[in-house]
UniProtKB/Swiss-Prot annotation:
<feature type="compositionally biased region" description="Acidic residues">
    <location>
        <begin position="31"/>
        <end position="59"/>
    </location>
</feature>
<dbReference type="Pfam" id="PF09649">
    <property type="entry name" value="CHZ"/>
</dbReference>
<comment type="subunit">
    <text>Forms a heterotrimer with H2A.Z-H2B, stabilizing the association of the histone dimer. Also, with a lower affinity, forms a heterotrimer with H2A-H2B.</text>
</comment>
<dbReference type="InterPro" id="IPR019098">
    <property type="entry name" value="Histone_chaperone_domain_CHZ"/>
</dbReference>
<comment type="function">
    <text>Forms a chaperone-bound H2A.Z-H2B complex that acts as a source for SWR1 complex-dependent H2A to H2A.Z histone replacement in chromatin.</text>
</comment>
<keyword id="KW-0143">Chaperone</keyword>
<dbReference type="GO" id="GO:0005634">
    <property type="term" value="C:nucleus"/>
</dbReference>
<feature type="region of interest" description="Disordered">
    <location>
        <begin position="1"/>
        <end position="111"/>
    </location>
</feature>
<comment type="similarity">
    <text>Belongs to the CHZ1 family.</text>
</comment>
<keyword id="KW-0539">Nucleus</keyword>
<feature type="compositionally biased region" description="Acidic residues">
    <location>
        <begin position="88"/>
        <end position="111"/>
    </location>
</feature>
<protein>
    <recommendedName>
        <fullName>Histone H2A.Z-specific chaperone chz1</fullName>
    </recommendedName>
</protein>
């Protein structure tokens, strides 16, 4: 009978419903009360909220960049008149290497 109770105890320890083992206290190195680990800073961590607020307050908005009264909503814009005020584009320089579909390409022609 002792063989049966031994195997029953082994089966009872196995299986579902087993509670988790007690957590063990694991300390790294000597003297777990070192404050050096608390002083180490993670380079990828975001800065504390206090520093972020200081940086944001240092960057003031330049008032000269704010445009007053330049709303265009609902206004009729004459694009033809606006185009006359702009200087002409120098498109001739950009068209030098353009070839239309009708032209043959000597470099790629197989025959």
């Amino acid at each position: 009978m002792s063989a049966q109770t031994g195997s029953a105890a082994a089966i009872g320890d196995k299986g579902k419903g087993k509670s988790a083992a007690e957590p063990q206290d694991v300390t790294m190195g000597e003297g777990g009360d070192d404050s050096s680990s608390e002083e180490e800073v993670d380079d990828d961590a975001p800065p504390p909220a206090e520093e972020v607020e200081e940086e944001a307050s240092d960057n003031e908005i330049d008032k000269s960049n704010i445009i007053q009264g330049r709303r265009t909503r609902g206004k009729q814009i004459d694009f033809a008149a606006a185009a006359k005020d702009l200087p002409a584009d120098d498109d001739e320089d950009e068209d030098d290497d353009f070839q239309s579909e009708g032209e043959e390409d000597d470099e790629m022609g197989g025959n």
